Amino acid sequence: MVARHTRSLPGDSGILAPPNDLHVNQTAGWIVLGLVSVALLTTLVSAVIITRRDRNPLFLLLLISGAVLFPFFVEPAGDIILATWYPPDTPAIAATILGRHIPWFVVIGYAAGIPVACYAGYQMITAGLEAKRLLLALAAISLSEGVIEMAAVHFGFMSYYGNHALIFGVPLSSLVQNA
């Protein structure tokens, strides 16, 4: 079990120190990395097909933004604000930014998921789908993201270590923010 920390890092203006007792099962880590890689390959093939078919680079540009902006800019800042931690022994760390480890499964997961969700939303809006259906689609995406985070916390791939109201290990604020 991950210990909850209440102390701050020296000189960090109240930023909570991350846990040092969280470890990842290496085999499970590599399996997750493989699964998100298959998802990325599917997204990449879809991006090429859709870009050629529609002669519109939007899907491909969303894939690039999902691979660059979210994991390397949004994720590290959000991890500090929400007191989120990926263990340093996670297989295949892509980068350490602002003292936060960003595993490749996070980078690849963003690259695989962001373009699909955004492009699907774009297609629904341009097709004139009513707001009720758009909100239902958003709810489905948000719920699936919540379940993925709950599983990641349960299996030790990540931890929320602040003083949060938790739902199956995930802060209520994170579930709302991901919506």
Description of each model-found segment:
Residues M1-A179:
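Aromatic-rich, lipid-facing transmembrane alpha helices and their immediate juxtamembrane interface loops
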